[in-house]
Every structure is written in C-alpha cells, then in structure tokens.
Design a protein with these regions (language model features):
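C-terminal motif of bacterial Sec signal peptides marking the signal peptidase cleavage site
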Residues: 17-19
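Sec/SRP-type N-terminal targeting helices
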Residues: 76-77, 93-94, 133-161, 211, ...
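Small/polar, glycine/serine/threonine/aspartate-rich low-complexity segments that form flexible
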Residues: 47-56, 105-128, 142, 251-268, ...
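Acidic, low-complexity, intrinsically disordered peripheral segments
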Residues: 9, 21, 263, 416, ...
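Membrane-embedded beta-strand positions in outer-membrane beta-barrel channels/transporters
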Residues: 65, 124-128, 172, 217, ...
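Sec-dependent signal peptide recognition
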Residues: 4-13
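Periplasmic alpha-helical coiled-coil/stalk elements that build and connect Gram-negative outer-membrane
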Residues: 139, 155-271, 385, 389, ...
Length: 482
C-alpha cells in the first residue's frame, strides 16, 4: 500500500511537471520609453477619441467617414473574415466537450412455417457518447489557439477600419487642396496673360523686344500646362475617395470647402506604455503570439498518451421470437469502455509538427516586437512632422506676403517703364510657387494631424485595457458565441 501510494504520488507530480513544461517560456516584449522624444513639453495626455475626425469641424467629412464605415468593401470582407474566425473557434471549442450520437432502426419481419404464418416488428434505439480526457491540455490549447485567432481577426478588422477612415480624411483633404491649387494655377495663367498684354503693348511702341514677347508667351504656355496635370490629379483623388466609400467614381461628387475653414484639432500623445493598449495592430500581434503559444502546447501534448472514454446504451424490442434474437440480447443494454493510445512510430510527424509550432511561436514573437517598435516610430514620425510644420508656419506666412508684394511692385514698375522684364517674370514665378507651396503646407499640416490620430490608435482601446495589462485584456476579450 505504501509503495503503491508513493508511485501514484510520484506519477501525479511527474504529470504536473510535464504539464507545466508544455507551456514553455513566454517571449519578453521590448520595454517602451518613458516618453515620446518629439512630444511637446507640458502637453496634455488626452488621447484621441473614437470620433477624432469631428475635430476638423467638417460636416461633409463626417458624412463621408460614416459612409465609408458602413459601405467600404474591404471592411465588409474583414467582417466576413471575423465571422469565419468565430466559426473556426466554435469548431475548436467543440473538441473539449463530449460527443453524443443517437440512432435507431426498425424492421418488419414476416414468414411461413408448419405452424402457419407469423410476423414481427423489430426496433432498436441506441445512444452513444465519447469523451477524450484532456489530461495534457491539448484540446483546451487548440480551442484557445482558435479563440485568440478570432480575437486577432477582430483587431485586424479594427486596424483596417482605422486605416480606411484615415484614408478618407487624407483623400478628402487632398481633393480640397487640388481644387485650391487649380484656382491658383488658373490665377497664374490670368496673371501671365495680363503680363503678356503689357509686353505686347510695350513692344508695339518700341519699348520692348521680341525676346521678351517670346519669353512671356513661353511662360504663359508653361502656366497653362500645369492645369491639365492638376485636373487629372484631382480626378484621381476623387476616384480614390469614392473607392474608399465603396462607390463607383462616375457619379461621386465632393462639395468641398476651403482648407482654411477647417479646424486643426489639438492632438496630444500620452505615455508610450499606454500606446500598446491603444493600437489594434499591436493587439493583433499579441493575440497571434498567444495563439501560436497555445498551438505549441497542443503540439507538445500530442506526443503524450490520449485517453478516450466511451459509453453506449440502447433498448431493443423484447417481443422477438428466440429464432431472430441476436447475440446482443433484448431489452436495455449498456456498454462502457476506455481506450488508451500512445504514439510510438509515425515517421517523426508529431515531432516535426512540434518543431513547426515552435518556429511559428518564434515568428509571432518577433512580429509582436516589430509591431511595438513600428507603433512607437509612427507616433514619433507624426510628432516630428507636426513639430517641423509648426516651425515653418511663420516662414510660410512671411513668404506669401512678401512674394505677392514683390510681384505687384515689379509688375507696376515694368508697366511704367521703370523696371526690367526679367524681374517681373521672376517675381511672377516666385509668387505662383509660394502660393502653391502654401496650399501644400496646409495639406501637409492636416494630413500630419490625421497621421498622429491614426498612430495613436484613433480612440481604439483593448478590452478592459484601463484596468488590466494587455495580456490580461486578451484573456478578457470578447469570445465567439458557442
């Protein structure tokens, strides 16, 4: 008795040790910095809200984003992928539950003998059940792996949604900027045409020469050449915006509003450590890592014995004649069984599967670390862009004011005969370039704010992220309906 109890306890301890070893060592995530390097001093720690695009104060933009959220075809495919992942998770979850089957049959028997004719009705009903004892956690790990993939699929959908909404905002701003650049280009053509009239009038009275006339005609043609290019770019931007809304571009129109009428929302980055709970792509990477870790547990457990319990019972018509009674007898029956199987030789298939699962876990661990680094870089780049654009704001305003003043002065002096033609031509080129550059600066500023909102997660949060670390949040993530 003593030896038997000792062996039993040793066996249990050994099984527990093996069960612990199946988990393996969890990869360590990189430690984020204490603060973002490019974050402005004394900035608030308010993260973007889920309706961050309202901050631009554009009703048309709000309507376009709402349309994209409901009609974007990529998002529709992503929602279908979520449904598929949920279905696979339900299939995997079924492996940890018993399976029960029911069956039945009925036969009509008739015959003749020396005693006359006879007939009987034979019927039977059977209920069977089987259950694999998940002693090593293989089935549970398989179910967990599928559940984490379903969680990752949801986060993938949210990442795509954030990318789509940011793309709508960027394309909308691009359309507005191209319209303004077209207006500036047409204004430049008109200014070049007016200057050509001045040069022609001076040439007719002998105050100008043919070279100046030809030069200005070339400048006018060059200015007109810009317009078709900008019109094509505008049409492409509108088409790109229509695609994001899931609509054909032929009938899609943008009402538009001046860029200067748009509000620039105040967006601040919080702590880098909080960023990891606010980026759906990082959440996806960690969920994939957890799935790979669970798959590795299942692959290791497959090397150990499996125990399957079976039970079946039924009832057969007890009124049959003895001549037609089978060996199983009549009336209620009950069968109980257990099967123990240990893989012995499979050509190395199970060990190769374990090696594959281990390599997959290593890949997902590297992908998780890469997602964290990429998230931090995205925020730093967006903050850096805004910082440099803020520094250039004053110079842009000064450049615009001085170039317009220089062009108007040079044009008047030339018209009055006090200035030379080359000064006017150079001033005209400069003022157009500065006006066009100023519009592109406004566009860059708006798109940098969009990029920062996107880099900060766009108001997304991991489930229960405010109360627990991300790994725990993964455990608490909404599960598929079983």
């Amino acid at each position: 008795m003593f030896l038997g109890g000792t062996f039993a306890r040793c066996g249990l301890i050994g099984c527990l040790c093996v069960g612990c070893s199946l988990q393996g060592a969890k990869p360590v995530a990189p430690t984020p910095p204490a603060a973002f390097d490019k974050a402005p001093p004394n900035a608030s720690a308010n993260w973007p809200s889920q309706d961050w695009y309202h901050g631009f104060a554009s009703a048309e933009l709000d309507a376009l984003i709402a349309a994209a959220a409901s009609s974007n075809l990529d998002l529709e495919m992503a929602r279908a992928r979520v449904a598929q992942a949920d279905a696979r998770a339900r299939q995997a979850h079924a492996g940890i539950l018993p399976s029960v089957d029911a069956g039945g049959n009925a036969n009509y028997l008739a015959g003749h003998s020396v005693n006359g004719s006879a007939h009987e009705t034979d019927w039977a009903a059977l209920l069977s059940a089987s259950y694999e004892v998940d002693f090593w956690g293989k089935n549970r790990a398989t179910a967990n792996s599928a559940r984490y993939l379903a969680v990752a699929s949801r986060a993938d959908r949210d990442t795509l949604a954030l990318t789509t909404l940011a793309g709508v905002a960027n394309d909308y701003f691009q359309v507005l900027s191209l319209r303004e650049r077209l207006a500036v280009a047409r204004s430049n053509v008109e200014a070049a045409r007016n200057l050509l009239e001045i040069v022609d009038s001076r040439f007719k009275v002998g105050l100008s020469n043919p070279v100046e006339v030809a030069t200005q005609r070339a400048a006018l043609a060059s200015a007109e050449l810009v317009i078709p290019e900008l019109e094509q770019s505008q049409e492409e931007a509108v088409a790109s915006l229509a695609v994001l809304l899931g609509r054909p571009p032929e009938d899609f129109k943008v009402a538009g509003t001046p860029l200067e009428s748009l509000n620039e929302p105040q967006v601040a980055a919080g702590l880098p450590s909080d960023l990891l709970r606010r980026r759906p792509d990082v959440f996806t990477a960690e969920a994939n890592l957890e799935s790979a870790s669970s798959s590795l547990v299942a692959a290791r457990a497959a090397l150990f014995p499996s125990l399957t319990l079976t039970a079946s019972g039924g009832v057969q018509n007890p009124a049959l004649n003895a001549a037609v009674i089978s060996l199983s007898g009549v009336g209620p029956t009950l069968n109980l069984g257990a099967a123990l199987a240990q893989p012995i030789f499979d050509g190395g298939r199970l060990r190769a599967a374990r090696a594959e699962a281990q390599a997959k876990q290593q890949e997902m661990a590297a992908s998780y670390r890469a997602a964290i680094v990429a998230a931090l870089v995205d925020v730093e780049n967006s903050l850096s862009a805004i910082q440099h654009l803020d520094a250039a704001r004053e110079f842009q305003n000064e450049s615009m004011e001085q170039s317009e003043r220089a062009f108007e002065g040079a044009r008047l002096r030339y018209k009055q005969g006090a200035g030379d033609f080359l000064s006017v031509l150079e001033a005209q080129r400069t003022v157009y370039a500065v006006r066009d550059q100023f519009i592109q600066y406004r566009l860059a500023r708006l798109q940098a704010l969009v990029s920062l909102c996107k880099a900060l997660g766009g108001g997304w949060q991991a489930p229960d992220a405010a109360a627990q670390p991300q790994a725990a949040a993964l455990q608490a993530a909404p599960r598929p309906e079983f």
